[in-house]
Amino acid sequence: MSSQPFWDERIHRWRCLGSEGNELIYIDEEQTWKDYDPNSLKMNKAGSTGAEVSDVTAEATEGKESSNGEDRHTKRLYESTSAEGYPSGSRNKKSKSENSEASPAPVINKAVYIQGLPLDVTVDEIEEVFKKCGVIAKNIDNGTPRIKIYRTEDGTPKGDALIVFFRSESVELAEQLFDDTEFRYGSGQKMRVQKANIDYKKEKTVNKDVGGALKKKALRLRQQQMQQISSWDDVDEEVDDKRKKRFNKIVVLKHIFTLEELDKTPELLIDLKDDITEEAEKCGRVTNVVLYDKEPDGVVTVRFSNNEEAEACVRLMQGRYFDGRVVEASIYDGKVRFQKSGKHTLDDEEDEEKRLEKFADWLENSN
């Protein structure tokens, strides 16, 4: 019966006693057990140095390991040997390599492929249109945008192109904004915008083995693009602040009516407007109430003189029942354009409110 393998520090190999009483040694390079012969040239080539062979020869004359030593090595074995009887170091190395091959790092797609472009389109035109989706990546060597217009062998544009963005989020935005739209308005020719095949990464024009100067240039270019993104965020925040100040006095109420009710009773609009005005005035001065008779959600907007009154109205109306329906109340975000009969819009209401305020000021000053 074979003994448990143990680690031999002198030759830096695993050893054990075979079933026939012969000594075995584990060869990492071949991942197998072989007969141990300290004088063998083959063993010397397998990893033992001349000094190690001398030590092993001396060990052979001294006899086998003592029982205490074997117990000690056996304990070490249980901590570092796999269930199949192989040294865990060799097995782990193999497992790690297998795992790395089985689970490659996820590839991030930052490019879109566009079809249906005008044949005379230029890189500048494409950049001008698609920069609305985010920062377009730059070529490190010359700083030009990473936009490739595909051409035939004689140099004629084929009507398709590739754009590489700085951030992956721009890809989805480009699809949403421009897929099935005209590149040039009125041309009748619609684009097809979709995620690019990941093989585009093989088309990079800069060698990976770049010098230090080019690496610094790449880092500087990346910092500039990050600053550009940051400045866009600042602009977006500024626009959001202005929008909030402009529309935070308007409350949107939903589920006040149904389109079927309005069809059956057109005069219901007047009654609803009076009822809502009366209820909303509990929160402050109401300057305008508009019912959007083309909205299936039964939308009504109420404009107050300030934001505090509008917030109070939201608290009052949110979740209340109106003719058997639960009312949704919120501050208008300025993004949605509700539909109603005629051309009257929220912007028209604001202009009308300004005119009324000026007229009120004129009356006060004239007196």
UniProtKB/Swiss-Prot annotation:
Q: Which family does it belong to?
A: Belongs to the HTATSF1 family.
PROSITE patterns under this entry?
Answer: RRM (PS50102)
Q: Locate the compositionally biased regions of type Basic and acidic residues.
A: 61-78
Residue segments, region Disordered: 36-104
- Function according to Swiss-Prot or TrEMBL: Has a role in pre-mRNA splicing.
Listed under subunit, the entry gives: Interacts with the U2AF large and U2AF small subunits.
InterPro entries xref list: Nucleotide-bd_a/b_plait_sf, RBD_domain_sf, RRM_dom, TatSF1-like, TatSF1-like_RRM1
Give an example GO molecular function: RNA binding
**What keywords were assigned to this record?**
mRNA processing, mRNA splicing, Repeat, RNA-binding
Q: Which residues form the RRM domain?
A: 112-193, 268-329
Tell me, which GO biological process terms does this entry list?
mRNA cis splicing, via spliceosome
Q: What is this protein called?
A: Splicing factor U2AF-associated protein 2
Q: Gene Ontology terms, cellular component aspect?
A: U2 snRNP; U2-type spliceosomal complex
Pfam families this protein is in?
Answer: RRM_1 (PF00076)
